[in-house]
Every structure is written in C-alpha cells, then in structure tokens.
Amino acid sequence: MADRIKGPWSPEEDEQLRRLVVKYGPRNWTVISKSIPGRSGKSCRLRWCNQLSPQVEHRPFSAEEDETIARAHAQFGNKWATIARLLNGRTDNAVKNHWNSTLKRKCGGYDHRGYDGSEDHRPVKRSVSAGSPPVVTGLYMSPGSPTGSDVSDSSTIPILPSVELFKPVPRPGAVVLPLPIETSSSSDDPPTSLSLSLPGADVSEESNRSHESTNINNTTSSRHNHNNTVSFMPFSGGFRGAIEEMGKSFPGNGGEFMAVVQEMIKAEVRSYMTEMQRNNGGGFVGGFIDNGMIPMSQIGVGRIE
C-alpha cells in the first residue's frame, strides 16, 4: 500500500483526476484513487466536488448569496450541506469557508430571521435600559459580545449572594409526641343532672341536695390534691333531717324505709372505700376528725324511731 500524500494537490494530479472522472464517472472513487498514487477515495471525492467539478462556482459570493447564507445559518446553524442546497453552484465546504472567513464577523451576534436586506429592518442588539443593573452571565458566545474590559468596572456589577441549601437530617432518638386533643363542650348548654328520688319527694329539693353534694365533693377533691391526705366526707346535721323527711313521705312502716336506706348507704360506702384503697395503694383509709370531718370507716346510720 502506497504512502498517503497529505497536502495540496498539484496541477498534474488535478488533470489526472479530471480524466479519470470522465472515464469512470463521479462515483467510483475507490477505483479512481487506485490510479492516483498517495490519494484516497475520500480525498479524490472532496477535490472533485469542492474544486474541479464544472458545477462548482469559483466567482465571489454575491450580496444575495450572503443574505441567503445568513438567513439559513440563523435557522439551521452549522448545517453547511443543508445551506449549500439553497445556492446554485456552491458546495458545503465553500459555504463554510466563506462564513468563517467573511460572514461570521459581519453577522455574528445578529438574528437574521426576518431581515430583508435594508438597514431599517436590521435587528439591533438589546441594550440595558437606563437605571436597571446590568446582568452579567459570564458567557460570551459571539465576537460581538462585550469583552473583559467592557465589564471591568466591578462597582456597577451586582454580586449575587450564594444560596446554600441545607438538607434536613433526622435527629437520632427523636420522639414525635401526638398532639393533645382538646374536647370542649358548649358553654351555652344548661347543666344536666340525674338523680333518683322516692315517690312523693320534691324534685327541686332533691336537685338542691344534689348540687350541695357536688360542691362538697369538689371541695373535698381540691383539699385532697393540695394536702395529699385522705379525703373525708363532711358530717352535717342536715343529713339526718333529710333522711327523716324522706321517711315521713314513705308509706307504711318507717322501719322498712330505713332498712332500704341503710343498705343503699352501705353499698355506696363500700364502693367508696374500695376506690379510696385502690387510689392509696391498698393502704388503710381513715384518720382523725379534722374541722368537722370524720373517717368514712366510722360513718353509720342508726335506726330512726
């Protein structure tokens, strides 16, 4: 295999290539290259298509061709083969060389779409409006862009603060407590109380006694929380009178009524004592008389004659 020759073609090689193209046609480049020592099929094709073909125009580019190239480049970019198809007698290599050598300096940074050739319709570079701070991107892609000396005045360039993003990191051992659920009742609702009364008893009287008992229990509970002592039921002289009034309204023998009352009181006291022992850890419930208070274990109801 002969050594490949790199560099410009000589006039003798150009003449030999013309004769071979006439003989084999402008397609059999592998066969043609075998007759030209040191030249590959690709090199022969490019030399013919870009320089020696009769269809290639060697005259200077006209103003109309320059405008067509500028419009096409704004639309297609560096697709030189596509742009060359829009021109008669111009190859992609010729169009590319003409753009890089001449048109790029003239048209760089301009958008030629919609340009009709007149100076009035030539797009103008967008300038910074008065009073607004300049925007510096640091990227200048065209020769028409400002150089370093144009933006050397750092006093007019706003420095944007850097933004740091922090990713939340879960803390070890963190406990998420449930939100407390508050349940509130309407303050407009009237108080409702349920009480049991014997036949013939006054309902309002029983209601008053129920409210008094509720107030007494609230006072006892607050004293228990404050002093951390065993609570007592207050001894009141009206308790015996209330039972006597209930006994008078009971039909028949009063002894039967007192028996029923005693059983009810025993059951209530037993339940209360059990609850108190449970709250005090199973200890003894009792104590001394203090301010009219007596231990629950010493409360009893005698027979009323």
Swiss-Prot record:
UniProt cross-references to Gene3D superfamilies, sorted A to Z: Homeodomain-like
Alphabetical list of Pfam families matching this protein: Myb_DNA-binding
Classification via SUPFAM superfamilies: Homeodomain-like
InterPro entries named among the record's database cross-references: Homeodomain-like_sf (IPR009057), Myb_dom (IPR017930), MYB_TF (IPR050560), SANT/Myb (IPR001005)
GO terms for MF: DNA-binding transcription factor activity; identical protein binding; sequence-specific DNA binding; transcription cis-regulatory region binding
Bias (Polar residues): 144-155
Tissue-by-tissue expression: Expressed in roots, stems, leaves, inflorescence, and flowers (including stamen, floral nectar, carpel, petal and sepal), mostly in vasculatures and stomata.
Compartment(s): Nucleus
Portion annotated as DNA-binding: 29-52, 80-103
Domain HTH myb-type: start-end pairs: 1-56, 58-107
Induction: By drought, cold, high salinity, cadmium (CdCl(2)), salicylic acid (SA), jasmonate (JA), ethylene, gibberellic acid (GA), and ABA. The induction by JA is COI1-dependent.
Low complexity compositional bias, start-end: 183-199, 213-222
Keywords: Abscisic acid signaling pathway, Activator, DNA-binding, Jasmonic acid signaling pathway, Nucleus, Plant defense, Repeat, Transcription, Transcription regulation
Top-rank taxon: Eukaryota
Annotated knockout phenotype: Increased defense responses against the necrotrophic pathogen A.brassicicola. Down-regulation of salicylic acid (SA)- mediated WRKY70 and PR genes expression, leading to reduced resistance to the biotrophic pathogen P.syringae pv. tomato DC3000.
CDD domains: SANT (cd00167)
Subunit structure: Interacts with PYL8.
Task of the protein: Transcription factor. Represses the expression of protein phosphatases 2C in response to abscisic acid (ABA). Confers resistance to abiotic stresses dependent of ABA. In response to auxin, activates the transcription of the auxin-responsive gene IAA19. The IAA19 transcription activation by MYB44 is enhanced by direct interaction between MYB44 and PYL8. Transcriptional activator of WRKY70 by direct binding to its promoter region, especially at 5'-TAACNG-3' and 5'-CNGTTA-3' symmetric motifs.
PANTHER family hit by this protein: MYB PROTEIN-RELATED, TRANSCRIPTION FACTOR MYB44
Protein name (database record): Transcription factor MYB44
Organism: Arabidopsis thaliana (Mouse-ear cress)
Record lineage: Eukaryota, Viridiplantae, Streptophyta, Embryophyta, Tracheophyta
